[in-house]
Every structure is written in structure tokens, then in C-alpha cells.
Amino acid sequence: VTDTKATETTDTAYPAAPALSNAEVAEHDISHVFHSWSAQAKLAPLPIKTAHGSTLVDFDGNEYLDLSSQLVFTNLGHQHPRVIEAIKQQADTLLTIAPAHANATRARAAELILSHAPEGFAKVFFTNGGADANENAIRLARLHTGRDKVISRYRSYHGNTGAAIVATGDWRRQPNEYATGHVHVFGPYSYRSDFWAESEEQECERALQHLEAVIKGEGPDTVAAILLESIPGTAGIMVPPAGYLRGVRELADKYGIVFIADEVMGGFGRAGEWFAFQA
């Protein structure tokens, strides 16, 4: 015998949300939500109700073109039907699982990623986000080399957690520079060259000379990792000159340093190849 009352669900269990205006949503948001990287007394967020493709729609029915793909992560556009369907199917099967267990979906995702990775990549370490990925990459580099220092660039962004924010190369790291062992260098930027370069080739050569000088100055046997965005994103889409990333790879190999390519913004097809360092 089945108790129909015990299993019955009704539409009244989750009543539909009332129609809201931009002004109402903004008021509630500002009152209750802490916005990162923002002066809380000066918040003026744009309320967004839904989106499709590259179009955002607010609560008053106005449409906007999403030129930044949010934080450069909506590669396939908003509300792509195949993505939504895949999320629904996985939610019906299993919502979450501890990392100690095996899971077919996660294993298949890792297999697909590795099928597009260059030779030498054997496993995928899944994390919750970019800062988390960089934190773990730094820890792995230090464990692998037995060294401490991490060299990263000015005009960079690597996340807002302990070591990631200190590796970040803009002023926002300064109130919280508690992680140790971080050194910054200038990267190539032909538009406002720090090396008085007159050509892309010269900019590349001098930026690599500068990086090697810092490695030598800090002591090669103290440097665990070079952490770079393949294409700096938050500081401006600064595409490196031809040969720069290859030169960094050669310096890392020369001194036994781990090269960490932060591609949270630049990877997975955004630069024309699966990984930006291949472009």
C-alpha cells in the first residue's frame, strides 16, 4: 500500500517569486550582499534576471550585450541548451561526491581534458576555482623542488586567497601581503614598455633578460616556480610577444624551476587553441 499523501508534491510547496523591478532587486542586493573588490558604500550593481547567448536581460526587460562574458567564463554563451541539459542529467544522477571516491563523470572529464593537452600531462587535479588551482600549484611546486620562492609578474591577477593574492601583481595585494616567498618581475608590454624596447622582438628579449636577472639575483636554488598568466586578463588583455612563453619555459628548465601557466581566463579555446600557451 502506498501512502499517496506522504509522497505527494504540490506546486504550492515552492510558490513563484513575485515580479520584481530593477530598483527592488538592487535595494535588496545592496542591503544584504557583500560585493568583492568593491567599496561597499558606493555599490550600484546592475540587476540581471536572465540571459541567453551573449545577451543579458534585467528585471525591467532591458537587454545588454555581455562583452566581457562575465568574468571571461561564458565561453559557450549564457543558457546554452546542451549545457543546461547536461547539468540536469547530472543533478538527477549525483549532485556531489567526496574527492576520495571514484566517479565516472569526473574521470571522463579528466580523460577529455588530457586528450587535448600536450604530451607529458598525465592527470587532472580538479579544484573549486582559479585561486584554489594556483594555491595548490604553488604548494606542489614547493614540494617538488624543495624550494620556497615564487616569481610572478606585475600587472597580473591570480586570485584572492592567501598566496594567490600575494602573487597578484597589482596594488590590491598590498594590504594583505602575509604569504612569504613571493617576488615580482615586469613582463613584456610593448604599449608601455618597461624596457625601452622599440620592437616586439626587443621587448621579448629584454623581458626574458630581466626575468633571468631576477632569478639569478634571488638565487636559482631558492626559486620553486614561475607563475604567469599566459595572456594577462584582468590587468588588460596583454598578448605576449612571439617567443616569450617559450623563453620562460627554457629558463624554467635551465634552472630546475616549475613553470605554472595560469589559464583560468585564457585557456579552453579562448586564444584559438585548447590552451593559450600553445597559441
How would you name each of these model-derived features?
Residues T2-A279:
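Conserved N-terminal phosphate-binding loop of PLP-dependent enzymes in the Aspartate aminotransferase
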